[in-house]
């Protein structure tokens, strides 16, 4: 009863206008902080591209790779938005709104840089060398997160001309978190401060015990409507409606992907990408390897280069955001979330269990 009253008493806080900017949430987990002794690179993606697909690319560089691409009417593989390659290198990014703005005529090049990195990088140091070699301005304003087969990880907070490196080995608790502000950027500017706290609060016990798993991220974070300022999960309240504000899953969310690196003595072929495509509470993970992508995650839709998994999640998302008039898309039907997410969660757990037998 006390918890329900707290939900009602703080309802007014939810009435604040939601920000229109898209915002990703990400994390790099060291081998020491993970339950299975394998490092993890995770990104909860937010973007205006409503559908994603996975694809393997060969013949464009030194290494073949599997990556996330924007869905479209045609198959375009020029910009990768998260991926892993045959050398055991993985990469992702989150936009950092408190870094210097790009030159107007050359911006939004992050996907091109990540595709190039997957084609030619083996180590974290290789990626820094790539940044050094790229023509300036680079057209980026972002936190690049990278992981390699030796278990090294880092964020590179990067603008058109410079970057600041944060190594995983120096991170308290063996984890690094980034949302949409750079630690090296303008103080108190940017976005995602509450989402950053959401991650810290939800995973506090697992970080302390070194027991994080890929499911902690794709299921524990990407399905959570916890709000750090309120101190509880909205989906656990008895209320039906919530405003889409400062949760990890947002109206603009289109994927949650945890790339599980390799353990000691393993080859890069042992890497697994746990991929949830579409609005994460309305979808489920599929296990992806460097030589195997489930058909539902490929661009196999009759509509064009879209994934069936993402399209199905989009249909279910309509039930979560049923109000179409005015600011309707800002309102979450928590009854629908609870029902749909619980169903998809069970499918995810079955996939995790199947792959780990």
Model-identified regions with their sequence ranges:
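C-terminal, well-structured catalytic/ligand-binding subdomain of enzymes
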Residues: 23-77, 82-83, 87, 93-119, ...
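Sec/Tat-exported extracytoplasmic proteins
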Residues: 31, 121-122, 134-135
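Charged, amphipathic alpha-helical segments
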Residues: 123-132, 237-242
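Positively charged n-region of N-terminal signal peptides that target proteins for export
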Residues: 1-4
